[in-house]
């Protein structure tokens, strides 16, 4: 466990993120819960906690600096990625975690209780049926960017942003058709030798 903590500390240095020992403990506790529930409920294709550390925790932390304001909706959150990871980092920021799969929301309610995360609100709802206003609308491995936009455009204002976490495929053909200002950021994930990108979309 200490070696995992050391790896987290090293990743935080690489990402230029300040975090307390308590937050590091919370991230590890979250991953342990995810690993445990995964054995029964198939929450994620990644089975081993060592792999989750890099492909889930560090991947989520790598976009932390792009989160603005005080509220975020995590669309198709699954096991709480990136929402739970970022909620631990930003305790003053409110995260609404949305998924249409009931067992995943059941897991997230367990995470909320176990870790005492008062700033997450897990909702078993389809995103197109959710109302509200958010500074960030984020998704990780949820859908194509054009589908993401179609399902979430009712949230978009001139003051907020949509963030799509992506692998190497930037979906240029889909981005061209969107009536949005688009920024593409190459994301370096500690200990991960794979191309990761963040697409930030704002109203023109």
From Swiss-Prot:
Subcellular location per UniProt equals: Cytoplasm
Could you tell me which SUPFAM superfamilies the record lists for this protein? Answer: S-adenosyl-L-methionine-dependent methyltransferases
Catalytic reactions on record:
guanosine(527) in 16S rRNA + S-adenosyl-L-methionine = N(7)-methylguanosine(527) in 16S rRNA + S-adenosyl-L-homocysteine
Functional description taken from the UniProt entry = Specifically methylates the N7 position of guanine in position 527 of 16S rRNA.
Q: Per UniProt, which keywords does this protein have?
A: Cytoplasm, Methyltransferase, rRNA processing, S-adenosyl-L-methionine, Transferase
UniProt cross-references to Gene3D superfamilies, sorted A to Z: Vaccinia Virus protein VP39
Entry annotated with the keyword Cytoplasm: yes
Q: What InterPro entries does the entry give?
A: rRNA_ssu_MeTfrase_G (IPR003682), SAM-dependent_MTases_sf (IPR029063)
**Species name for this entry?**
Francisella philomiragia subsp. philomiragia (strain ATCC 25017 / CCUG 19701 / FSC 153 / O#319-036)
**HAMAP family reported for this sequence:** 16SrRNA_methyltr_G
Indicate what this protein is called per its UniProt record: Ribosomal RNA small subunit methyltransferase G
């Amino acid at each position: 466990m200490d070696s995992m903590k050391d790896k987290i500390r090293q990743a935080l240095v690489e990402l230029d993120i300040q975090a307390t020992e308590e937050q590091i403990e919370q991230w590890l506790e979250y991953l342990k819960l995810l690993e445990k529930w995964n054995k029964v409920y198939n929450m994620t294709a990644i089975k081993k906690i060592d792999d989750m550390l890099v492909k889930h925790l560090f991947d989520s932390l790598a976009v932390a600096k792009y989160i603005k304001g005080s509220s975020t909706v995590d669309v198709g959150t699954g096991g709480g990625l990136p929402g739970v990871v970022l909620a631990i980092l930003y305790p003053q920021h409110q995260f609404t975690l949305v998924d249409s799969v009931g067992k995943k929301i059941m897991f997230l309610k367990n995470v909320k209780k176990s870790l005492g995360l008062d700033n997450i609100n897990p909702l078993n709802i389809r995103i197109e049926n959710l109302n509200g206003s958010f500074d960030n609308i984020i998704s990780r491995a949820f859908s194509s960017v054009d589908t993401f936009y179609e399902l979430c455009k009712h949230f978009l204002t001139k003051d907020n942003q949509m963030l799509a976490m992506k692998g190497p495929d930037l979906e240029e053909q889909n981005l061209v058709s969107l009536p949005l200002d688009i920024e593409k950021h190459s994301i370096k994930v500690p200990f991960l030798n794979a191309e990761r990108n963040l697409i930030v979309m704002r109203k023109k």
